[in-house]
Amino acid sequence: MDTVLKEKINLGISACMYGCKVRYNKKGWNMSELFGRDQTSFIWHPVCPESLSGMGIPRSPIRVIGESGKAVLEGNAKIKNREGKDVTDMLIKGCNASIEALERANVFAFVYMEGSPSCGVYRTTLKNNRMGKPPGVFGAMLLDRDFFLIPANDLQSPVRRWDWKRRLYAFAWAKEVDINSKDDLFQFWHIVKFLCQEIDEKTAREIGKRLAELPKGFDKESAETLRHEVMMILRQPSSLEKIKNRLWKHYMYFKRKTGVELENVMEPTDMRNMNHIADELMLMEKTSFSTEVLFGAAPILYRGR
């Protein structure tokens, strides 16, 4: 199986995180620049549900009155602005317009503005509770549609940014790769299993056990179930400790296989800053690709135009 993406990923993003000054107070920040040269690996699709709702810029800040954005969609909560005006219907229409735009572009991943009553997923600003009860209205729609979700604030950390990028590449690959035989299924799992084990070892081990016990023949439905399980795992972030431990483990394998030493790769317990760790990870990616040795922590790379 080819493990190199050649087509750019269509990546949605909260417009205020793409430098568009569309927040209620006319502010915005370009978080996509944090990807550096990698930002050209994506086709960006900025949307702002609040702007598309017709509320304009600047506008009165809004809040959820009730349980959460999901409850708003179910008709059990309201959206009101600072003056107390009910803008529920307007915001839902803006969210629907945003979803329609993303779906037209075949977008399946989204960089969202955390803390927003519209785009927030795990933290929102609700009445009398700054942390709120997530998700926001648009965030609830993204969750319902199984989007690969990236909190914009995480892009400020070079290691977290690397983690999101490698999992997004693997997610995009897993979503589209053909699995039409038992051999395809085993090869698919071999490519992603090390990354899955790092993120969720228990579930990954269970998947491996099920594969080992498969009966003869190929069952397409079972293969698609496994694909979905893998994609659910890949949505979850890893941790710094796991990343460092797996980096060292993969480096030891690479060193034994090639005889090549990489002086910049340090042991998990060695002290260094986030930029150094990110440099180690990218060095392993580059060297593994050039020597055709699988780097299990980042098995899928983008090498398009």
Go through the PLM ranges and name each one.
Residues 83-103:
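Glycine-rich anion/phosphate-binding loops
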Residues 18-26:
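Short N-terminal binding/cap micro-motifs at the start of the first secondary-structure element
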Residues 221-305:
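Extended non-globular C-terminal regions
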